[in-house]
Each structure stands twice: as C-alpha cells, then as structure tokens.
C-alpha cells in the first residue's frame, strides 16, 4: 500500500513470537528434513516471520488433531501475528492460503477458526451453502475448488473486535468450463457438487413434478466421465445427506421459499440446457430441451432455439451459473451482516462509551483478508513475485529506503517471470494474450446475456439474477467481487503454504497412518519449484522485516519507552536495546523491524502503565487529546487535519488554537459516519456507486428517500422572497404574455403537466423565441424564394437568347419560334413529318436551344392580307446562313408545296395545325434587353423597334423590297409604318404608333410575321431591386468568408518557441468519463513538454457519480489512476458552492501527490466534491456542475491573490500546494483548462504560454481541438470536418481581432493576472461574481450558465476586459472524444446551439467592441447570430434550389452555386495548403450530413430550450411589476457553516510553514495607485524562475521566522505511489516519488522539509530538503549555492528603483558581479543570470540598459 501509516492500539495483549533459529544457509535438504519432522508431529513450519509451511492430505484434514479440531495442520500463530499487526499498527493485513500441489485439501474454513477473532456461526453456514457451487470431485482431489480466489474479509476495530465480515470471489471468477461444461471424460471426475445434491434431494412430489429431473446419466453435462457418486474412500461421503445439509444452510442464510425454488429451478434449467449443446443434437431433442428450459427459466424457448447458437448456449450456461453463485454470495453476506449487527447492537462495549477512547466510529477499522488460492500456478506467482521482485511492493520500499536488498539470481528471476506469465490475466496484467482472450470471452458472455436477459420474463428469478438493477444492465462478474492484485498491493501480506507429501492418488492414502504418505522426491520438487530454500535465505538474512515506521511515528509510538526525537534519538534507543545486528534498520526515512524486535518493543509498551487518556487516532478535532504525548502529538488537531488524510503529519505540530467551529458557530453538516460497515480501501469516499454488492450500502433496497414535488400554488413553502427584476426583463415578460395570453395556464398545468409557474413561464418564453426564430426563418425563405416573384411576376417564365441556349439537352429541349419559347422535349423524338423525311436524333439535335423563325414562315396571304394576295410572294433572308438545314423549312400552300400527299400543301396548315399544336408546348416569351435592341440597330444595321414592349424586326422585309427594287408586290406595308422602322431603328416608337387604319391593318402582319419577342421586363427596377439587395448581402457574406479564409492562411513555417518557465495550473474537471479516457487525458498532461515543476494537475471530481459503463464512481477511478493509496482518508472540508439554498454548502476531500508517466513526474491535486451528509442518499452527492468546479479554482486563486480569508477546503488546497508540493500558489500565472477526456499534444502548453509571453495583452487563448474517435461511428464522422473548419475559419478570423467569442472549455488557457501590474483577470472579483450566479431561474440564464458555461465565461472576460485579446493559435493541438451515438450528439448540440444563441445576444450587447458599423466585430457577431438562427432556412433554400434545378422549373441558380462553390472551395484550399488531405473525404461526408446539422439539430435545439432539471429548492411563482416572487423550500444556507480564515492566521494557529505576512499590503500602501476596480494588482508576485520578472515577495523574508532551523514541521511525501498501479505499497516517505529531473539528495538533505521559500530567514545560507522535491528555490538540486538556481536568494536590494530612471550602469555591474559570485558557473545559463540580476535590482531592464546588461555579463565572465 502506498501509505502504511501506522497507528497503534493500546488494547494489545502480548503474544511471543520469536524468529525461528535457522542455519546460516537453508538448503532444500535441510528444509525437507525439517518439514518432514514437523509433518510427523502435525505442526506447522515457520519459514520466516510472515510465512508458514504445512503438509496436509485429505486424510489429515479429516482427522482431529490434539486439540480436537479438524481441518488439517494450521499455523495459528501466523493468524495471531497478522491480527496483532492489524490492530496494533492499524494496517490492513492479507493472509494468502496457497497450495504447492493440486491434491492438497482446502484449509479455508479451518483457518477462519484459527483467527483470534469471533467469527459468527452464520459465516460457516454460508460456506456450507457455498462450497457445493465452487468445488467438484476430481481423480486427484475429492473436493477441488474451481475458483481463482475466494476471500473472507474481516473488518476489525482497533480493539480487535470484528465489526464486519464478507465473502467474495475474485474478479477472475469460477472455472465453469472445467467444473461443468468440459468435464474430463475419464473416471473420477464430476461436475460441481451442487448438481448432484439437486438430484439427490428432491423433497416433495410437487417439486419433483415441476423440475422433472431424471437420473444423472440423462444429462450431457454430467455423463461425460460416467462418475455420479462421491469417492468411496471418503468415509462420510453421501450426496443425499450432504444435500440435506446444503438445503438447511440455504435456508439459514435467507434463501428459502420462492428464492430457493428459483435457485433450484435455475440449476435444473442449466442441467437441461446442457442437453441442447453440441453439434450432434437431434432437432427434436433440441426443441424438447429448449421447451423445458424455457419453462424453468421463464424464457421463451424460441430465444434459445433460434437466437442462440450452440456456442451461445454454452456461454449462457456459464454466465447464468456465475450470476447464480454471485447471488448466493450476496445473500450470504446479507445474512452475515445481519447477525453481526445484532451482535454489535447487543454488545455494550461496541455501542459507544463516554470515556476517552471508548467511542469508536465505523471508520476506526482495519481489515484482515483471508484469501484462498487453490490453483498452484496462481499461488506460486503471487508468492514468488512478492518475495523475489525488487521492483514492486514492500521490496521496492525497502530498497528505496536504503535497506540492502540482495540481488536475485538470473534463474530465479526467470522462474518468477515464467510463473507470472502463466497467470497474468489473474494478476491484472493487461499486456499479454491471456488478458485479451479473457476480455474477448467476457465480452462474448456479456453479449449473450444481454441478448437473453432482455427476453426473460419481468418477474422471473432469472431476470433478478441477470438484471438486479435494470438501469445498470448485465452486471455478472462485476458486483460483489474483489480484485486480487489490489488487495495484495494494499495490505501487509502473510503466506500460509500447503504442501502435499505425495503424488499418489487420494484413494491410496491410508487412514490408519495419516503421515505415512511421504515422498521425499515429490516434496523436494515442490520446494524447488517454489524456490522455498532461496526464499528462506533471502528473508531470514536481511529482509525479514514485518513492521516499519516513519521517524515521527516511531517516536510517537515508543516515546514512553525512552525513545527520543530525531534520527539520533531513534538510533541511540535502538542501540540501547541491542537491536543493531539486523533486528532493526534505520533507513533514509523509515525504521524497519524484525518480528522479534517489534514484539519485544510492543511487550515492553504493554507493560508500561497506560496514560490517563487514549486518543482515537482516526478522529480529528477535540477528541484528539492526550496529555501524555509530547508536543508533536499531544494537542488537539484542527478540523481540517487527519492522520490518514492530510499528507503532512500535522500531529508533529503543537496546535495552538482549535479550528473555528470549536469556538461556536454554525453546526457542521459534513458527511459523518457512513451508515454501513467500513470496508476500507476506498480513499475515504465510501462505497457508493461501487458495483460490489457487499461494498455498496446504497443499493436500491436501502436507498429509498422521499423526493416528492412541491407544488408552490397549493403547498406550504417555508417563506416567500421578493427580488427586484430589471426593466429589460419586465419588458420581455410583458412581450411574452402579449404573444401567449391565449394559452391558459391551466391547460399548461394539466395538459402539459407543468405544475410549476417558473416552468410554465419558461415554456412560454421558449414558445415566443421559437415563434421569433420561425418568423426569421420564414422571412428569409419568403424573401429569397417568394418576394422576388411578388415584385416581378413570371420572371422565371421568360428567356433571352443565351438562356434559351442552355436548354439544349435530350431531356431539356427548348426552341423559340417567332418570339415565343417552347419546350418540345416530349415532341422532338416523335415522327412528326408526313413527308419522306424521317425524324431522327441527328436531324433534330442541331435545333435544340435555337431560334427557328426562318424554318417556320407564316403564309403572307393569310396574315398580311389585304397587302399580299399571291402565294408566290415570300421574304428573302438577309442572313445567307439563316437556313443551314433546308430540309427543315416549313412552307405551306400549293405554290411552295405542290405535293398533295403532305399537309403542308394546305395554305391554312400554319394556323390550323401548327399554331394549335405548338401552343401546347408554350413556356413563355423570348425577351431581349433594350440595349440588345439598340445594338442590333447600331452595330448590325437591323431594323428593330419596340412597340408596346413588343419587338419587331423588318430587316428581311427591307432586304426583300430592295432586292426587288421596291416593287409594290414586295414593299407591301404602308409607308407610314415602314418609315418608323427606318427612322427610329433600335428605339421604342410606342408614342409614335398611330391609331390609324394603316397601323391597325399592319398590326396582324407584324405580330405573326415580324415579331421577335418582348422587352426583357426583368431589367426593370421592380425586378432588379430585390437582386441588388440580395447581392449586397451576398457581397457582405462573401467578404466575411474571404476575410475568414485569409485569416486562416498560415503560409509561414511552423513556429518553435523556446521553452517557457511560467507556472501553470492544468485544471481538469471530471464528471462521468471512463477510465481509459481519464487515463489518456492525465497521461497527456503529464507528458507535456514543459518543466514538470512548473505545472500542476488540478483535478476536480464533480460528485460521487458513476458514469455509464463504469463500475465505480469517477473520483475513485481518478485516484486509482493517480496511484493514491485507497486507505488514505482525508477529512471532508466545507466550502462554498454554486447552488440554490443549502446547496451553496458543499464538502470536499483533498488528495495530493506526484504522478509519473513516461519518466515525467508531475504534482497533482485532486479535489473530490462529496456533498453534505443529507445528500448521501441521492444519486449524485456533491455534484454542482462544471461551472462550480471552475469557480472553485477561480475563487481559490482569487483569495490567494488578495490574501483574503479562505474556506477550510481552500486552506487545505493551499497547504497541499504550498507545503506538500512546495510551490507558492501565488506563483501560478496561467490556468490551462482541459476536459478530462481530452488529450493534449506534448508541445501545446509551451506554445500557448509562449504566445501569451510574446503578447502581454492576451487574456485567453485556445488551440485546435480535433476528434480522437473520428472513425468510431457515422455520427463521429460527420463531426470531423466541422471541428476542423470551425477552428481554422471561425476562430482564426475572430483571432485577427483578438475577439474569439468562445474559448472551448475542453482546451483553452487563461492568464490569471496582467503581466505588467498584476491586475487579476479571470480570477477578478467581477468575473467570479457574475459567473458564480446562484439564481439561475430564467430561460436565458439557464442557457447561459447551465448549458454554455465555457462560452459565457469568454463573454464575461470580453465584457470586463475589452482591452485584452482572446486568441486562437493553430499550432497548439488537442484531441477529444466526440459523441458516438445519435442521442448523445443530439443532447450535445442542443446545449451548444442554444448556448450559442443566448451568448451571442450577450456578446452583441457588449460595449467597446473593436471597429464600427459594418466594419466591426459587433456586425460579425450579429451575422453569426442571425446565421445560427436561420440555419433551417438555409437548408430549406438549398433544398428548394435542388428541386428547381432537378425539376427544370426554374433558371439555373448560378450565383448561389458560385457562392457555395466559393465557400467550400476556400475551405478546401485551407486544408490543402495545410496538407490535410484526409479532409477532402471528411468534407464530402459533412456535406452529406448538411440537413442534420442545419435543419434537424437546430429545430430540435430551439424547441428544447426549456429542457432543464429545474430543481425544487427555489421556485419562481410569479413576476409582478418589478418584483420576482420566489418560494423557498429549503433550510437555507448559513454562511457560518463555512468558516473563513486567512492563511497566515491558519498557518500560525497550526504552526505551519509558508506564512507570507503583509508584504503585499505594505507595498501597496507604499507605492499606491496600484488598485483598480477593487482588483488587487501585485506586480511583484511572479514566478521567481521567470526570466525578466521583478523579485517575488516570497524571497524578501517575512516575519515569524523560526530561527535557523525553522519550524519543526516536516511535511512528509504524498502517499501517492510512484508507479501508477493500484495498490503499489510505496513508503510514506519513499524517495521514489522525487522528480525525475532532479538528482538524488544525500545525507541530511533527505530529512528536512520541502522548504517553502517564505519561511526561510534572510540570512540563511544552507538549505535542507526531503527526497520528494527540493524546496521551490532548489528544484535544480544545487544545495550549496545561494541563488534561486541553486539555493536561497539574498534578500531583495534595499534600493527601490520604482518611479526613477532605474539603476545606472554601476549598479548593474555590481549586481552582475554579486550574482556571478553566488551561482554555479558550470550549470547556470546566461538567461538565469539575467533574471537574477533583474530580481536583485527589482526592475525589468529594457532598451539600452538591457543591451548593457548582456554585454556586461559577457565581459564579467571573460574576466573571471
């Protein structure tokens, strides 16, 4: 265990246990002879102080010994020693019962009787009921256990009384395959005994009929070996008698009636289901078996028959059997617990007493776990690993502490590795194939059980087995199990090894001479295989230590025997006792004692008279009073301390004052004693959420609590509050009621089931917002789609010549004839000619999209009458190429078509046939712009005029008349008409058109023969104004897109900033993340390429919550990953939280230590919010939300900055950072916020800090976040491109203005205070006050603070610090896990979209935004807001465009297509330039998902704006005028429940180092003018490792010094182990946990405090520090120098250059020489020298003086 802090009990009674005398070297022969002698005498052999050997057979196990006890040879002294160590040293013990041979009998039950504990009889009854499920007859053992490991875990108080007992299988479970499914086919083997008891004990005819059981040979599972009876050589073996005892035992543990019938039915069903396995089963037999099994198990036979394969049915048998065994164990533990509780209730000594020490809480317990490991391979691996592996467990601790550990030979090391490799899955080693194979099998079992479990009848016994808690799913193998490696790693291990004397089969052993069976070769083989001779030699010579103490603990334990303080005092006392020959060893940090020496000391202690008062070392507060203890242990402990909690041994200080609550004040309501037996090893967090049933007092049957609703309209709340509301809110409420007055409240109350007024009001607000959003969307859609048609009807029903040419496809065949456009797509393929010309594609294709006036000439005699009377008169074409295809010319009349076989022969063909037919294909007019008409007249000399918007062309007429010398036959039109064409060609002659007979008669001729089309009305202002408006918006949008594109271009080389030296807090809020995600995230922070000493991982676990898929609460997972010792139990300390009413009070536990990953060792702080005692029955005790986790850290740093009074939790955090980790919290300058499931790239932190260092105006910064599970599902794939482009377009653009509107909480960094004056930024009062708003009771606030806290925090920073910048840098990179399912994605985007809308409203209202009017960030924000709101309209419009294009119902939307192509084209350019080729595919997937992102998700989100958990503490029951009426159903929050105290006062009261004095305040008064807006500015509080920062106040020397040696306080190392494996038993003060980048300290350096800078006297020239970390000014490991690089800096200069011109060159030179005289020139850098000089001068040198400084440093170095 990581922290084996020893606490003694004064209730010990002596028992002598001397170390056995042994030869100088133990050989296999001497060991064999000794073991034989002990075997013959029936005695155990003690191999070393913690290991015993016994020899047992089934014969010796069934015979009574000299004491009349059965069960074989047992070492009762070993049990007694383990018990004494547990109760005297308050450390968990584990006794491992293992066997070297498979024939050895189990001694589990006999050993429990050997323990000096009162084991309740019900425990042995429970084992009687349990054994048949776990053991089977084999040829080599009549009762062979088929489990991996079975444990009995005793919880005992410090008096040694049993207060808890539970049985548990290990997580590896049972070998059902060997015990049931694959029994060997040879004789002598049976299945689990329980099945034979089932067949032998049918008690009633009704039971026999119901179960319908047959002979054992009828069942495939039992008939393989042909053995159905117990071994005949066992004198008392009878299945029927054993079955009766088995049933009686079941009843005794509460399995009776329906429960027992269900158990028996399940067993019978498994037997019958075995007949349905195998590939050779007949179909009829299979159906019959499934029918029977279905009836017994309450399962549809079709599920077994068709849904399960043969393999599935085998897996089902295995899974159901293990579930059944787990259930029996659960019932057994319940029975044991009930009997124990009854015993404790009737025992006055355990119910509490009034005397000192007589009152013991359930927390005052330690555990003794007896673990039975029947399989020799696993037992061997466990044993030899513990003895011979020097890199783990107690051996590693001893080695690190200076104990000489003899090296292990190569052969032994190979044996250990080989033994471990055989059972690596059982030992939790996940790297081998065995682990992966087991995981596959468990996954397969889970799959089959889920498939079957959901089909089982709801009220059936099997469903209760498989789904004990419906919401948790299948939990087989997860509930009620213990983890073997964790148990071994967190306890002191004792070994009890059983040896078998022969390989002979059991039936050959004689019952008359029990010890006659002895084969020296067989026993010798077992001794050699287990390396027991080497074991004895290794332990007895140097490593046989069974007790270890740290220095102070040892003195505190034995001070009454004359042991003096300090290392010298301890060594002297040991020498006085003669314990210098190996009986005791004083290591670097601990004292190690052999059993004989320890027991001698304990015996002497017992003989001493007891002191008048005995303190309970587990309690803290005013119960810790012991008048006889010395100054380091005899005074009351403060409430915030605990022996097992705080890692700094606060018992070593005289507490001069008590905690505030001792002087009166509000009563603490912290979680007190758990309501169940303390099982230990749970970090002091209790067992809530753990899947182990025996360890879970909060299971459903015990966790009922009243959660009724309070109806404020009919209920009786405690009191009513009235709070003022703003005018804006009043206007909004009035507006909402104006729009929703028609919806009666009673309808919402009874139909909508909204009983609360605030919920109804939120619904009304949501409805109004939805209506506004729909209105915006409707207006946009209407304006884009319909408004243009209203202004300009039929604009899509006209075509110009160019547009006509676009319709030239086979399925889009348009033509124009005499000014009209026709769609002849359905006509052109038809054979429409009655002449010999065939209609073919090649004939018709040339005419597609063309004007065909010349091919369809109207007969002049029909349409120009009375001017033309002869059919021979025709017009000649001015264009010689007018008729490219003469065959297509259509002339009607007998003159032009003399053939009578065609309809063209008829002169009326054009008007009677052609015009009616072509009219059916009419689409609209052919239009020409006025400019085109004019150009035809001026450039082409054509006679075009406009009359009443109609265009006529007389060019061919004039050409024909001129061709025939103006013969009247061809110049047939009146001259008054033709003169207008000649004189006004290209013009509009409407006003000149006369209403005369000539004009009227000419009109028909012009309309049919010379008509060209109409004037393009789409060029009119009414038709163009809408286009111009849309174009202007398009230009603006395109401009924004273009600017975003330009801002995203990063054409330069990737920057490689120099390593930075700022102190950074990595804030990690943890909620429900899984273990893999948490481990990956924490590992990534640890591996950051940043100075390990300058980063702190600050994890805040938001409540005791079990995430989906987890088997324990998130805090336990985090602490397990970080390697915290499960026995560490810090106190729960009060703090203020975000919440309503009493929820403003919360309690938290603080853990600290070092975490190692890939050679990086980083300090961490873990704060677990555990909640008030009244919350412990709730599902989420302590949970207050992510915002509260952020506020907790921000408020702490704010109080550190202002040196303001802190809460007890904050004081403990300060203490852990300042005194344990060794860094003044005020040194931290940045806060990196990272989600727990986010992995950060190694160089990201350095890049973020470098960017902030280069630009002091940056207050917040973020990098790129991508997906780490991009290919996990379709839902993750559609998010990849969105994540990428949202950063490289949106955030890159906003970063240009220094106004990133959302710094994502999953990966961003904030500056804590300004670089120049130290003005607080994110930790300022103004930001915290608004961000910590408790009254989140409106829809707007809910969306701001409950959904989008990260975005709103950025908004607040922008609001209060508009002059600062908020940047995005693409070089910093992190990856996070995106939602993998639709439901999770829907929930996430609901939060994101709604919070975006509400936050953008806030941002748009901010003052001091850069730019003005359309050239401002405000305009961009409004565009983003509108763009977010109208996302559905965008999607609808795109769908509309696709429909129009696909259906050919409108013109091709060229502009829209160009814009879309531009948008995605520019985006493509970005990732192509960045060589992110994969995003081509991701972009395509994203486009395919466009309707999801822009329609489904937004609409769902908008409608779900009021989907919150509203709580029932504070209910808004109405808003009247300028008041909000609130009903409060809560006891309220008493601020006195969180006492506040300044750190200096607290440190002084508790004699702690690190007091900082009033330097900051005195400096403020001295220099004045350094405070703005009540924000403390401290430009002198910077990292003293920064290159150019003023001297830190912590180097100036404060009052209250403790003299040369300072305080006697010696903060110990964090209990967290060096390796991040659970249960690693690192020493309490192990130097394994030092930083890897710091050399080992030697000698006296390893015995002193971490040394906070502020506690050192000015003149001190030498420093001592512990092996954990050097003091903060000595992290580089140079003990003898006097600078911050290698030791303590001199006090700051007495001169002050503020307000003057700064130091002159002489002062600079003098400072350089002084610094160079102090530092180690072999290791110091020029940068460090420059920092030291500036620190000494208390100023930052700039310009010429900076140049002089650099030059002078070089000069001084050259002259040295």
Swiss-Prot record:
The keyword Ribosomal protein does not apply. Polymerizes chitin, a structural polymer of the cell wall and septum, by transferring the sugar moiety of UDP-GlcNAc to the non-reducing end of the growing chitin polymer. Plays an important role in septal growth or maintenance. Mediates colony spore formation. It is an enzyme of class 2 (transferase). It catalyses: [(1->4)-N-acetyl-beta-D-glucosaminyl](n) + UDP-N-acetyl-alpha-D-glucosamine = [(1->4)-N-acetyl-beta-D-glucosaminyl](n+1) + UDP + H(+). GO terms for cellular component: cell septum; cell tip; myosin complex; plasma membrane. GO terms for biological process: chitin biosynthetic process; fungal-type cell wall organization. Residues 1-17 have a biased composition (Low complexity). Disruption phenotype: Reduces drastically spore production. Keywords: Actin-binding, Cell membrane, Glycoprotein, Glycosyltransferase, Membrane, Motor protein, Myosin, Transferase, Transmembrane, Transmembrane helix. Glycans are attached at residues 275, 878, 906, 995, 1394, 1584, 1652. The chain crosses the membrane at residues 731-751, 767-787, 1029-1049, 1419-1439, 1452-1472, 1480-1500. Residues 1702-1758 form the DEK-C domain. Residues 1-374 form the Myosin motor domain. The keyword DNA-binding does not apply. It is found in: Cell membrane; Cell septum; Cell tip. This is Chitin synthase csmB. It is a multi-pass membrane protein. Its EC number is 2.4.1.16. SMART domains: Cyt-b5 (SM01117), MYSc (SM00242). PANTHER family: CHITIN SYNTHASE (PTHR22914:SF13). In the N-terminal section; belongs to the TRAFAC class myosin-kinesin ATPase superfamily. Myosin family. In the C-terminal section; belongs to the chitin synthase family. Class V subfamily. It holds the Pfam family Myosin_head. Residues 1-23, 344-363 are annotated as: Disordered. GO terms for molecular function: actin binding; ATP binding; chitin synthase activity; cytoskeletal motor activity. It comes from the Eukaryota.
């Amino acid at each position: 265990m990581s922290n084996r802090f020893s606490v003694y009990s004064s209730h010990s009674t002596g028992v002598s246990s001397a170390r056995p005398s042994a030869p100088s070297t133990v050989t296999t022969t001497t060991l064999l002879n000794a073991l034989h002698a002990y075997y013959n005498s029936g005695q155990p052999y003690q191999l070393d102080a913690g290991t015993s050997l016994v020899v047992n057979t089934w014969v010796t196990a069934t015979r009574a010994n000299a004491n009349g006890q059965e069960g074989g040879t047992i070492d009762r002294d070993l049990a007694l020693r383990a018990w004494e160590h547990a109760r005297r040293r308050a450390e968990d013990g584990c006794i491992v019962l293992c066997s070297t041979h498979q024939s050895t009998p189990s001694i589990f039950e006999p050993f429990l009787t050997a323990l000096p504990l009162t084991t309740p009889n019900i425990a042995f009854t429970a084992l009687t009921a349990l054994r048949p499920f776990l053991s089977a007859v084999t040829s080599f053992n009549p009762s062979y256990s088929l489990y991996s490991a079975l444990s009995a875990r005793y919880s005992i108080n410090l008096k040694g009384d049993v207060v808890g007992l539970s049985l548990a299988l290990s997580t590896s479970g049972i070998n059902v395959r060997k015990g049931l499914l694959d029994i060997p086919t040879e004789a002598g083997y049976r299945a689990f005994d329980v099945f034979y008891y089932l067949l032998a004990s049918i008690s009633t005819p009704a039971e026999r009929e119901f179960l319908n059981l047959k002979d054992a040979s009828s069942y495939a599972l039992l008939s393989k070996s042909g053995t159905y009876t117990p071994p005949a050589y066992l004198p008392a073996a009878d299945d029927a008698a054993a079955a009766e005892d088995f049933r009686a035992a079941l009843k005794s543990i509460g399995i009776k009636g329906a429960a027992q019938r269900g158990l028996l039915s399940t067993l019978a069903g498994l037997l019958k289901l075995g007949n349905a396995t195998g590939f050779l089963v007949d179909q009829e037999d299979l159906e019959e078996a499934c029918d029977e099994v279905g009836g017994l198990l309450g399962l549809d036979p079709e599920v077994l028959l068709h849904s399960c394969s043969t393999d599935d049915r085998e897996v089902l048998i295995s899974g159901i059997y293990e579930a059944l065994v787990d259930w029996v164990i659960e019932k057994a533990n319940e029975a044991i617990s009930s009997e124990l509780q009854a015993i404790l209730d009737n025992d006055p000594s355990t119910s509490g007493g009034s005397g000192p020490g007589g009152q013991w809480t359930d927390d005052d317990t330690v555990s003794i776990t007896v673990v039975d490991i029947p399989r020799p391979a696993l037992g061997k691996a466990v044993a030899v690993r513990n003895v011979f592996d020097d890199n783990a467990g107690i051996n590693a601790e001893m080695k690190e502490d200076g104990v000489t550990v003899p090296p292990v030979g190569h052969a032994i090391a190979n044996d250990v590795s080989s033994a471990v490799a055989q059972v690596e899955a059982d030992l939790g080693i996940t790297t081998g194939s065995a682990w992966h194979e087991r995981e596959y099998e468990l996954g397969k079992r889970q799959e089959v059980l889920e498939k079957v479990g959901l089909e089982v009848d709801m009220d059936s016994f099997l469903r209760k087995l498989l789904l004990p808690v419906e919401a948790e799913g299948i939990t087989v193998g997860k509930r009620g199990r213990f983890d073997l490696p964790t148990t071994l790693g967190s306890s002191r291990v004792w070994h009890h090894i059983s040896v078998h004397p022969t390989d002979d089969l059991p039936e050959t052993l004689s019952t008359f001479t029990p010890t006659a069976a002895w084969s020296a070769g067989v026993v010798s083989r077992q001794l050699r295989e287990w390396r027991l001779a080497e074991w004895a030699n290794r332990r007895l010579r140097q490593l046989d230590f069974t007790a270890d103490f740290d220095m102070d603990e040892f003195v505190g334990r034995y001070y009454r025997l004359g042991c003096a303080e300090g290392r010298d005092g301890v060594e002297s006392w040991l020498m006085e006792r003669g314990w210098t020959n190996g009986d005791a060893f004083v290591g670097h940090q601990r004292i190690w004692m052999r059993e004989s020496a320890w027991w001698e000391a304990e015996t002497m202690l017992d003989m001493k008279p007891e002191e008048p008062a005995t303190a309970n070392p587990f309690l803290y507060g005013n119960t810790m009073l012991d008048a006889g203890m010395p100054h380091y242990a005899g005074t009351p402990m403060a409430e915030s301390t605990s022996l097992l909690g705080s890692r700094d041994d606060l018992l070593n200080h005289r507490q001069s004052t008590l905690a505030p609550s001792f002087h009166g004040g509000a009563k603490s309501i912290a979680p007190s004693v758990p309501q169940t037996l303390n099982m230990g090893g749970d970090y002091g967090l209790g067992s809530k959420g753990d899947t182990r049933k025996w360890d879970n007092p909060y299971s459903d049957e015990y966790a009922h609590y009243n959660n009724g609703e309070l109806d404020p309209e009919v209920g009786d709340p405690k009191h009513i509050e009235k709070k003022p509301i703003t005018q804006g809110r009043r206007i909004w409420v009035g507006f909402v009621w104006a729009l929703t007055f028609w919806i009666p409240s009673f309808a919402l109350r009874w139909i909508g089931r909204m009983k609360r007024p605030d919920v109804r009001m939120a619904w009304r607000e949501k409805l109004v917002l939805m209506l506004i959003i729909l209105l915006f969307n409707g207006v946009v859609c209407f304006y884009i789609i319909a408004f243009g048609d209203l202004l300009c009807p039929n604009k899509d029903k006209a075509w110009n010549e160019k547009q006509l040419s676009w319709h030239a496809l086979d399925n889009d065949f348009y033509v124009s004839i005499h000014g009209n456009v026709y769609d002849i797509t359905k006509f052109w393929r038809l054979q429409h000619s009655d002449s010999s010309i065939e209609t073919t594609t090649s004939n018709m294709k040339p005419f597609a999209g063309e004007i065909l006036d010349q091919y369809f000439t109207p007969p002049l005699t029909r349409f120009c009458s009375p001017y033309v009377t002869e059919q021979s008169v025709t017009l000649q074409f001015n264009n010689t190429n007018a008729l490219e295809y003469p065959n297509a010319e259509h002339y009607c009349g007998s003159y032009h078509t003399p053939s009578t076989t065609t309809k063209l022969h008829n002169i009326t063909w054009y008007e009677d046939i052609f015009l009616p037919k072509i009219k059916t294909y009419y689409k609209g007019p052919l239009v020409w712009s006025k400019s085109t008409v004019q150009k035809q007249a001026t450039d082409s000399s054509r006679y075009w005029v406009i009359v009443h918007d109609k265009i006529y062309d007389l060019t061919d007429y004039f050409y024909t008349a001129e061709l025939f010398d103006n013969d009247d036959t061809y110049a047939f039109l009146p001259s008054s008409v033709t003169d207008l064409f000649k004189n006004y060609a290209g013009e509009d002659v409407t006003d000149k058109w006369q209403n005369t007979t000539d004009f009227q008669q000419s009109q028909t001729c012009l309309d049919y023969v010379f008509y060209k089309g109409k004037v393009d009305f789409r060029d009119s202002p009414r038709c163009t104004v809408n286009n111009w408006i849309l174009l202007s918006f398009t230009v603006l949008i395109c401009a924004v897109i273009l600017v975003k594109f330009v801002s995203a271009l990063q054409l330069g080389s990737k920057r490689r900033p120099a390593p930075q030296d700022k102190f950074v807090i990595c804030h990690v809020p943890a909620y429900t993340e899984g273990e893999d995600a948490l481990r990956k995230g924490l590992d990534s922070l640890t591996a950051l390429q940043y100075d390990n000493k300058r980063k702190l991982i600050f994890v805040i676990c938001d409540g005791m919550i079990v995430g989906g898929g987890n088997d324990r609460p998130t805090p336990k997972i985090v602490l397990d990953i970080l390697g915290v010792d499960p026995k560490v139990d810090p106190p729960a300390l009060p703090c203020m939280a975000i919440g309503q009413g009493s929820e403003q009070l919360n309690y938290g536990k603080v853990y600290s230590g070092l975490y190692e990953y890939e050679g990086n060792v980083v300090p961490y702080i873990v704060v677990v919010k555990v909640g008030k005692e009244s919350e412990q029955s709730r599902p989420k005790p302590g949970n207050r939300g992510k915002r509260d986790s952020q506020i907790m850290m921000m408020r702490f740093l704010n109080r550190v900055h202002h040196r303001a009074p802190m809460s007890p939790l904050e004081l403990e955090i300060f203490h852990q950072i300042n005194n344990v980790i060794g860094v003044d919290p005020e040194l931290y300058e940045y806060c990196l916020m990272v989600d727990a499931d986010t992995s950060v790239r190694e160089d990201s932190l350095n890049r973020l800090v470098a960017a902030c260092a280069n630009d002091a105006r940056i207050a917040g910064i973020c990098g790129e976040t991508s997906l780490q599970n991009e290919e996990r599902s379709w839902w993750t794939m559609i998010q990849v491109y969105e994540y990428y482009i949202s950063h490289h377009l949106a955030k890159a653009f906003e970063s240009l203005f220094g106004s990133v509107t959302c710094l994502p909480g999953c990966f961003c960094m904030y500056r804590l205070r300004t670089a120049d004056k130290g003005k607080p930024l994110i930790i300022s009062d103004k930001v915290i006050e608004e961000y910590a708003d408790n009254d989140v009771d409106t829809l707007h606030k809910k969306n701001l603070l409950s959904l989008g806290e990260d975005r709103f925090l950025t908004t607040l920073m922008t609001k209060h610090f508009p002059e600062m910048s908020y940047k995005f840098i693409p070089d910093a990179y992190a990856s996070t896990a995106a939602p993998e399912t639709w439901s999770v994605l829907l929930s996430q985007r609901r939060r994101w979209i709604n919070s975006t809308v509400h936050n953008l409203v806030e941002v748009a209202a901010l003052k001091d935004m850069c730019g003005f009017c359309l050239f401002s960030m405000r305009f961009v924000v409004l565009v983003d807001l509108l763009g977010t709101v109208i996302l559905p309209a965008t999607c609808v419009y795109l769908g509309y465009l696709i429909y129009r294009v696909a259906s050919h119902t409108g013109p091709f939307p060229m502009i829209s297509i160009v814009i879309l192509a531009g948008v995605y084209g520019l985006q493509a350019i970005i990732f192509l330039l960045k060589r992110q080729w994969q995003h081509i595919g991701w972009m395509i997937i994203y486009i395919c998902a466009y309707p999801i992102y822009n329609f489904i998700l937004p609409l769902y989100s908008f409608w779900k704006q009021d989907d919150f958990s509203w709580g029932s503490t504070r209910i808004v029951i109405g808003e009247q005028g300028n008041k909000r009426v609130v009903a409060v159903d809560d006891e309220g929050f008493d601020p006195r429940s969180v006492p506040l105290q300044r750190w200096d006062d607290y440190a002084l009261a508790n004699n702690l180092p690190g007091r900082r004095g009033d330097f900051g305040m005195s400096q403020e008064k001295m220099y004045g003018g350094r405070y703005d807006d009540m924000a403390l500015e401290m430009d002198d509080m910077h990292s003293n490792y920064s290159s150019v920062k003023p001297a830190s106040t912590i180097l100036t020397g404060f009052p209250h010094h403790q003299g040369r040696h300072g305080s006697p306080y010696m903060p110990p190392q964090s209990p967290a182990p060096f390796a991040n494996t659970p249960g690693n038993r690192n020493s309490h003060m192990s130097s394994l946990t030092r930083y890897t980048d710091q050399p080992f300290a030697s000698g006296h350096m390893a015995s002193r405090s971490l040394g906070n800078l502020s506690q050192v006297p000015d003149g001190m020239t030498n420093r001592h520090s512990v092996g954990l970390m050097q003091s903060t000014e000595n992290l580089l490991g140079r003990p003898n120098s006097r600078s911050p690089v290698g030791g303590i800096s001199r006090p700051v200069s007495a001169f002050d250059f503020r307000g003057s011109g700064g130091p002159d060159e002489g002062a600079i030179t003098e400072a350089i020489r002084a610094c160079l005289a102090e530092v180690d020139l072999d290791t110091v850098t020029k940068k460090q020298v420059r920092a030291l000089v500036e620190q000494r001068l208390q100023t930052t040198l700039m310009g010429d003086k900076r140049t002089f400084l650099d030059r002078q440093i070089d000069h001084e170095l050259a002259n040295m």
